[in-house]
Amino acid sequence: MKETSTFSQKLKQFVLLFFPIFITQMSLFAMSFFDTTMSGHASPIDLAGVAIGTSIWIPVSTGLTGILMATTPIVAQLVGSKKKEDVPQVVIQAVYLAICASFVVMLIGFFAVTPILNGMRLEEPVERIAAQFLSIIAIGIIPLFTYTVLRGFIDALGKTRTTMIITLLSLPINVILNYVLIFGHFGFPKLGGVGAAIASTATYWCILIITVMIIRTKEPFASFHIFKQLYRPSLSSWKEFLKLGVPIGFAIFFETSIFAAVTLMMSNFSTTTIAAHQAAMNFASLLYMTPLSLAMAMTIAVGFEVGAKRYNNAKQYGFIGIGLALAFALLYSILLYFFDDEIASIYTTDIQVHHLAKEFLIFAILFQISDAIATPVQGALRGYKDVNVSLIMTLIAYWVIGLPLGYILATYTDWAAKGYWIGLIIGLAFGATFLLIRLFQVQRKYTIENRRSR
């Protein structure tokens, strides 16, 4: 990141920041995408098992990943304010925190997974695949969370192209292992959805190893000497980190877990409905990678400018990010409307699943505008380190408005499973409105503060 003086310079720098993040997120998502699509071609039961497993795993992983994402705005503001010497301490303490969080998640999962799955009244093969999927994924928790911290450090320096290269190097490993283990090629057993979990876990370890090697040997990362000194664990540092990270993590958890909750509630419907819902939701999540990537870029850009006390520049980056998100939303809405049949065919060859997935995809169009506003706005707010109010706003929008409304529509109207999608759409719309208002308030506060300091 560097200081800019014109709007065109900011736009160029933002796009150069965003594009590698986008490729990185798409590559990471591709792992989940291939897990789902390949499992679906193994059988509808494998697809349903992976759907249930990921619906439990994703909210947990994204919520804790969100907490660890606090590394990015903290480091970005330190770099912006010329406090490079403080960065290694922040990163190492965050790594310690990531490892501790990993063990806590594994311990809770050991006791909680079986009761959760038993309470869902799934078909026996689906429950078995989901349980095995989660058991294997647990082995990849430590590398995934540790990588999240190290990626936050790399991205905060504006070197998003590096994380893109790391992920692109790892993606072929995931695809090849999926192909071999799910379908049983080259003498390996045919494991179905369980093979997808093994492939993802192995890939997480590969990503971590590559990242550590780059940080130790390549500039500008090596000059920070991140691993030169292993600082003693500092509870006060953890507390400061968590003050920012916990609201970020819970805000992400509230958003992702509502989708997972809907998938779990779908267990009351048939395996066909679960599979169709998972296919449509998986593609909607693919499109979500764009506003999510824009949000990450906004956190870096806004955080850098706020650290340097260039508040007007931070405000301009906010508008650039939201404008680009709305443009992409329009493009994706057109894609969903005209190519729903082709998209559904990617996930399944089962006629019933295919037909129902097409119906769900139409609802995904309505997700686009809300996601285009809410997600980038959250990224900008993180750059300002304003996270507590947005946490409350997302809780209300998604869990007080969206999910209860979806349950009512699905249970007491003829919409059935589609009622959950309508509830999600309305909840996302409220969330986008709340968050946009908050961003305007924060920008105004910093504008007034800037005038007073002159």
UniProtKB/Swiss-Prot annotation:
Transmembrane segments: 13-32, 47-69, 90-112, 132-154, 166-188, 193-215, 244-266, 286-308, 317-339, 359-381, 388-410, 420-442
Molecular-function GO term, any one: xenobiotic transmembrane transporter activity
UniProt keyword Membrane, yes or no: yes
GO BP: any one term: monoatomic ion transport
Similarity field: Belongs to the multi antimicrobial extrusion (MATE) (TC 2.A.66.1) family.
Function, in words: Multidrug efflux pump.
Name this polypeptide is given: Probable multidrug resistance protein NorM
Organism: Bacillus cereus (strain ATCC 10987 / NRS 248)
Gene assigned in the entry: norM
